Amino acid sequence: ILHIFTHDNINFNIMCNNRQSAASNLSNEQLQVFLTSQLGDGHIHTTNSHSTYYVTNCKYEEYINYKIQLLGDFFKNKRKLEKNGFCQTPIWEMRSKSSDILVDIRNMSIKDILNHLTDLGIALWFYDDGSLHKTDLYYNLNTHKFSEEIHRELFVPYFKDK
């Protein structure tokens, strides 16, 4: 099935695995949040009952609220975890509603994800996994989870063209 997303005169064509889905209902903003879950923070999770949803967290409630705004009617709930991780510090967590389209997005290749990223998606990716070096005034994008091949063949050419 070929899903076509249209928002602000931008078309997003995503080839999926022969399933019906809610894809035609995604806005560009929703799509960008879900795409960046495959690159940076956030995760698309499938439960034992085959319900698939997006979840992310951040210590800054304002950023979680921004992602909630972007998700619009795909937002399900938000909560504060008082003790998280090794340091046991508070963190905010947000979850989307379940949708089959999230399975298709999770299964997209990195190349296809990069081809569908807009400036908003790049900004979300940098906020999730970037770091500003204030002394030398440059950003680092932490992409350690990806192979050297993906860096060489996809990320380097992608950012050279930006």
Task: State each model region's role.
Residues 1-162:
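Internal intein/HINT superfamily modules and their associated LAGLIDADG
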